[in-house]
Every structure is written in C-alpha cells, then in structure tokens.
C-alpha cells in the first residue's frame, strides 16, 4: 500500500519597507518569489520564519514577526503537491545591504532584491496575490489571517 502524500506547510515572508517589497529573484527561470520555505517538523511558525530568514538573508538578519497576513492553498495534483502557505508580515533589521544578497544555498543564480510595491512585475509568484497585496499595503495591512484560498501560480 502506497503512503498517502503529506501536506507541506510553507512560510512566505512579506517584508515591506520604504515602499519596497523584499523578494528573491531566480535568474535561471526569470521570476520573483516571496522569501521563505518549508516549516520543519517540530518548529513553531515563528521559529521556522526566523530560520528561513537567516538561511536566505544571512545569520545576522533579525526578523520582527508582525502577523500572519494570508493563508493560501497550494495544490498541484499533477505533481502530487499539496501545501498550505502562510504569508507572514514582518520586518528585518537591514535594508540596502540586502539588495543582491546571494543565498549561499542557491549560489549566484538567485538573490534578494527590493521591488517597488506599487509597480510589481508580472513574474512575481503567486501572480494572483499581487493586486491584493498592493491594496492591503495601502491600508497598512490592517487585516490578518485572511484565507485567500487556492490561487494559481
């Protein structure tokens, strides 16, 4: 009997500062995505978020965890993927120093970059979240824990 696939919990950071959004750019695939990764077994959401920030932005980066903004279903049955994504609003203790920070895990093909939050590119994934994020930014992210359902890539 085949084991049932597991549901993965992913943490995605929404780091907005000075009208900019901190994301990762993948130069091989030419797209942007929110910084984050999988929640490990035995970790709290806060511990996982802090670990992911350090892994992707450096050991000296501190995360100021504000709140969970969005909860999203991530379903790709054709790839046996089923996940739950938590988009976390937070802040970090650095700004300009993070531009083009290379994540050692991914070499020189992926790096952190700040994007103008009012002019986000079409290749920021998930695309379906962009307009909502921009509207919520204008409202100072007043809501929290909002279920946004299943969104296409």
Language-model features: where?
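Conserved beta-strand residues within beta-sheet cores
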Residues: 10-12, 62-65
């Amino acid at each position: 009997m085949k084991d049932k696939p597991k549901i993965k919990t992913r943490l995605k950071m929404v780091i907005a500062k000075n009208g900019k959004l901190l994301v990762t750019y993948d130069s091989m695939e030419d797209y942007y995505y929110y910084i984050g990764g999988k929640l490990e077994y035995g970790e709290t959401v806060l511990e996982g978020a802090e670990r992911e920030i350090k892994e992707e932005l450096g050991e000296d980066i501190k995360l100021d965890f504000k709140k969970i903004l969005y909860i999203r279903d991530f379903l790709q049955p054709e790839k046996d993927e089923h996940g739950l994504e938590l988009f976390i609003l937070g802040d970090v203790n650095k700004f300009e120093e993070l531009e083009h920070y290379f994540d050692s895990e991914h070499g020189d093909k992926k790096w952190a970059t700040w994007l103008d939050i009012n002019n986000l590119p079409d290749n920021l994934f998930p695309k379906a979240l962009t307009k909502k994020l921009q509207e919520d930014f204008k409202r100072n992210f007043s809501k929290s824990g909002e279920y946004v359902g299943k969104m296409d890539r």
